[in-house]
């Protein structure tokens, strides 16, 4: 499924003054999928590391910020031979490894040739708990649920999406019935990727509601844990 944020990631990749990037966003908005898809599409290799229940990798960053040592550990953990020019390093669930978040400063200052993206669903909460943040040493990108144009693309309605981009209102008005139909479905699904994908495949409103309920329970659980 197409996410417009992919274009912003590509712009980041091409920047001459690129810094490590932190992908911000709530749970279930598709951060992990986007990072992996970006790596698969635009890099020869992706070294993916998740810090969720991964004490070994958390300990790697707790030791010190020697980038050469860190890269050697990432090589072994990911099973990927990391080379700066063609490897995307993905550090997922980074809120579970405060020192890994802090290490982005050293990637920026001492090893800017590496392409590093980090993400964490509860990162905003973690920062409020006093975790050190690499101010000025990272690029930021916010990811949200599907917007209406992305939803149209997911429903294989690229023609309708392209018409919106032209802002040709006579053309758009000519297909107002189609836009209203899909807008109602967009409002119903809400734009979360798992919901959109299920609706794309099955058009089952009961399934949509069940997935939405599961996501709400996850959010409630997160809130109760804080």
Predicted segments with their positions:
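Pre-Walker A adenine-sensing motif
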Residues: 2-15
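Conserved lysine of the Walker
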Residues: 31
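Short glycine-rich substrate-engagement loop in P-loop NTPases that contacts/grips substrate
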Residues: 55-80
């Amino acid at each position: 499924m197409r996410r417009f944020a992919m274009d912003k990631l590509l712009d980041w990749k091409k920047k001459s003054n690129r810094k490590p990037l932190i992908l911000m966003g709530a749970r279930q908005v598709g951060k992990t999928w986007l990072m992996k898809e970006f790596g698969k599409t635009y890099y020869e290799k992706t070294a993916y590391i998740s810090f969720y229940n991964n004490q070994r990798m958390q300990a790697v960053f707790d030791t010190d910020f020697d980038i050469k040592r860190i890269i050697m550990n990432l090589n072994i953990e990911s099973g990927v031979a990391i080379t700066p020019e063609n490897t995307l390093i993905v550090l997922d669930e980074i809120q579970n490894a405060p020192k890994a978040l802090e290490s982005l400063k050293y990637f920026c200052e001492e090893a800017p040739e590496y392409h590093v993206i980090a993400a964490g669903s509860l990162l905003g909460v973690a920062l409020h708990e006093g975790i050190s943040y690499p101010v000025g040493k990272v690029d930021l990108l916010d990811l949200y649920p599907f917007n209406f144009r992305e939803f149209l693309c997911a429903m294989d309605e690229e023609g309708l999406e392209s018409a919106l981009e032209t802002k040709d209102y006579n053309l758009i008005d000519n297909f107002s019935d189609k836009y209203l139909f899909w807008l109602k479905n967009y409002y119903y699904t809400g734009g979360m990727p798992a919901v959109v994908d299920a609706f794309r495949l099955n058009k089952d409103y009961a399934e949509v509601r069940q997935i939405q309920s599961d996501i709400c329970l996850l959010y409630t659980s997160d809130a109760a844990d804080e």
